[in-house]
């Protein structure tokens, strides 16, 4: 391992104009209780040795480092204390299932400082007929009628993330959505917030003429996360993008596995 890694470092150092990011890979789950797949004890220790070399090289050479290993290991540890048959991995103990992959994406984006950055955010004071704040979106033509209706044009610069609730992929048994049980993904990365203060009673939210839901003035004052509503036009647009990406993946798989 040491000799091979030294050779890899030599290659990386030779590319002076390239930003190097070392990634500590996901663990081999030795502690998952599965009678059909006995673990290779000690395999994860070897993986951890490689990650230590990566971390040391990153510090020495001022390279970036992202750790997938320890956060995934910690989720497995906590959940297996409740249920020894829990794992974020597939049946081979090394490749993450969909919920594990979603957690990897979360840890990677969080390491880039994206946690807390909203999909979009709109803050309106209806009593003063004012847009108090808008983040990562355009808000125009705010109108508050004497009858209590409020309307405005809204264009977000991002789409909400459509957390998949269907298990997809070869030998995958879990869903992306399950990852939200183990990390604050929605809270940190998937917030499309509409907040309206200065209201009384209940209001029906319509977007592009579609009725979305009804909310109390109290809920609107606290803020509604539109990214959690699957029937908004923007969520449905995001789902279409997701399906296009799934088709791209299927095409790639056909090239890699022609027999499928």
PLM region descriptions:
Residues 1-260:
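Alpha-helical cap/lid subdomain in secreted, periplasmic
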């Amino acid at each position: 391992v040491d000799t091979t890694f030294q050779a890899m470092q030599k290659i990386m150092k030779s590319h002076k104009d390239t930003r190097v990011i070392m990634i500590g890979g996901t663990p081999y789950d030795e502690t998952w209780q599965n009678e059909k797949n006995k673990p290779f004890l000690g395999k994860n220790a070897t993986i951890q040795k490689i990650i230590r070399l990566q971390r040391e090289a990153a510090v020495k050479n001022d390279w970036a480092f992202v750790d997938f290993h320890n956060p995934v290991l910690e989720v497995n540890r906590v959940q297996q204390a409740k249920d020894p048959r829990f794992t974020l991995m597939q049946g081979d103990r090394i490749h993450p299932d969909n919920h594990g992959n979603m957690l990897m994406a979360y840890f990677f984006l969080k390491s880039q400082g994206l946690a807390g950055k909203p999909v979009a955010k709109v803050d309106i004071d209806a009593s003063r007929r004012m847009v108090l704040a808008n983040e990562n979106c355009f808000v125009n033509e705010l109108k508050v009628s004497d009858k209590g209706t409020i309307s405005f044009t809204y264009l977000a610069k991002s789409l909400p993330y459509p957390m998949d609730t269907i298990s997809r992929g070869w030998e995958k048994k879990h869903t992306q959505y399950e990852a939200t049980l183990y990390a604050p993904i929605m809270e940190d990365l998937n917030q499309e917030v509409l907040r309206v203060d200065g209201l009384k009673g209940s209001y029906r939210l319509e977007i592009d003429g579609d009725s979305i839901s009804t909310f109390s003035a109290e809920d609107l004052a606290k803020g509604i996360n539109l990214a959690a509503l699957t029937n908004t036009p923007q969520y449905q647009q995001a789902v279409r993008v997701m399906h296009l990406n799934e088709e791209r993946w299927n095409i790639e798989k056909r090239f890699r596995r022609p027999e499928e």
